[in-house]
């Protein structure tokens, strides 16, 4: 059943040219449970940020595809719960492609230093270097610390993506 679900999701996303779903890509697919208790979570995004109407459009198309597939198994659309959504703030970046739309935003990044130790910094994503290549890097401007009421600037950090363990966009207060 898991393979049928994945096939339906990818089929719908591939067929979105010229529709509300154009430009949408799959971030992650999570399937929990089985039979009548199956819960399907589809996280999608675009390079400019996905809209609610796009999620609703894709949800309808994916549900239609799954219902056709499930009829052959004797199940109906009432036998599964489908949620199509955006990863949103507070969710870790999964795909390298997601970074581009977050340039300028505040991030909390956990990464491995050259010596193998782990470090966490918060700062603004300023740039993505060589995004199409293996040695891609992020340029993070760390949040400055305040000393005696004055903000002290911190130097930008360039982090290789292969050393990034977790990167989470955060809301600015």
Swiss-Prot record:
Single GO biological process annotation from the record: ribosomal small subunit assembly
UniProt keyword terms in alphabetical order: Cytoplasm, Ribosome biogenesis
Transmembrane stretches, start-end: none
Pfam family, one: RimP_N
Keyword ATP-binding listed: no
Gene3D superfamilies in UniProt: RimP-like superfamily, N-terminal (3.30.300.70)
Broad class of where this protein is predominantly found: cytoplasm
Annotated compartments: Cytoplasm
Keyword presence, Cytoplasm: yes
GO terms under cellular component: cytosol
Family note: Belongs to the RimP family.
Cited function: Required for maturation of 30S ribosomal subunits.
Annotated protein name in UniProt: Ribosome maturation factor RimP
Organism from which the protein derives: Chlorobium phaeobacteroides (strain DSM 266 / SMG 266 / 2430)
Lineage of the species this protein comes from: Bacteria, Pseudomonadati, Chlorobiota, Chlorobiia, Chlorobiales
